Regions:
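Active-site-proximal alpha-helical scaffold in enzymes
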Residues: 75-105, 134-168
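Single conserved hydrophobic/aromatic residue that forms the stacking wall/gate
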Residues: 183-192
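Molybdopterin (Moco) oxidoreductase catalytic core of the xanthine/aldehyde oxidoreductase family
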Residues: 118, 126-129, 141, 153-154, ...
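Short acidic alpha-helix initiation/capping motifs at coil-to-helix transition points
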Residues: 23-25, 132-137
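Short acidic, glycine/proline-enriched helix-loop-strand junctions
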Residues: 109-127
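Ligand-binding pockets and gating/stacking loops
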Residues: 168, 174-179, 183
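Conserved beta-ketoacyl condensing-enzyme motif
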Residues: 17-85, 91-114
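Condensing-enzyme catalytic core mediating Claisen C-C bond formation in acyl metabolism
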Residues: 1-19, 147, 156-157, 190
């Protein structure tokens, strides 16, 4: 089997921008191609997805209609990761040598207004707050912590490290380190 490498990366700065989610995705794709010193015409495949900013294959007319197959991936918040895994296996299998993987999204301000029925879930799921990602993931991490003996302190340190890393990244949404004592305020969801 073939070795697989990520040879280029691109990212659009986080934040509120007037451009569409698709525009932001194309920005990141062009940046990744440039970073790898390759052209769109060099790509043998593309996997991409977006939960709410349109179909990733809508990039084709703007990147170039060169016959490259572009496969849409949909897996909610994990769409980008699932696209990456798909691209990995496309190369690892030996079927292709080089491809593009992208994931992008753009959400309106405020809480997500997902409808449980669209996801095959009962109404009580939303009524109890489980359609809100903060509540859902807070409950999920609490269960994971209990099952595997992960301490509260460990979780807080992960958040601290993430903020520190964000302070080093010019494209990050939050670029200010946050002290452990502030992160520790609100168990289990925390303000950060």
């Amino acid at each position: 089997m073939t070795e697989v490498y990520i040879v280029g990366a691109g990212i659009h700065p986080f934040g509120r921008h007037d451009s569409t989610g698709l525009d932001q995705g194309i920005f990141a794709v062009r940046q990744a191609l440039s970073d790898a010193d390759v052209d769109w015409d060099d790509m043998q495949f593309a996997f991409g997805g977006s939960n709410s900013a349109g179909s990733a294959d809508a990039m084709l007319p703007r990147l170039g209609l060169n016959g490259t197959q572009f496969i849409n991936v949909a897996n909610g918040c994990a769409t980008g990761g699932s696209a990456l895994l798909s691209g990995y296996w496309a190369i690892k299998s030996g079927e292709f040598d080089m491809g593009l993987v992208t994931g992008f999204d753009k959400h309106a301000r405020g809480a997500f207004a997902a409808k449980p029925k669209n996801y095959g879930l009962p109404e009580w799921y939303a009524e109890t707050g489980l359609m809100m990602t903060t509540q859902f993931f807070a409950m999920k991490i609490k269960r994971y912590m209990d099952m595997f003996g992960i301490t509260d302190e460990s979780l807080v340190r992960v958040a601290e490290k993430a903020f520190q890393n964000g302070s080093l990244a010019p494209h990050a949404w939050r670029r200010t380190p946050v002290d452990l004592s502030l992160i520790h305020i609100s168990e289990p969801t925390r303000p950060y």
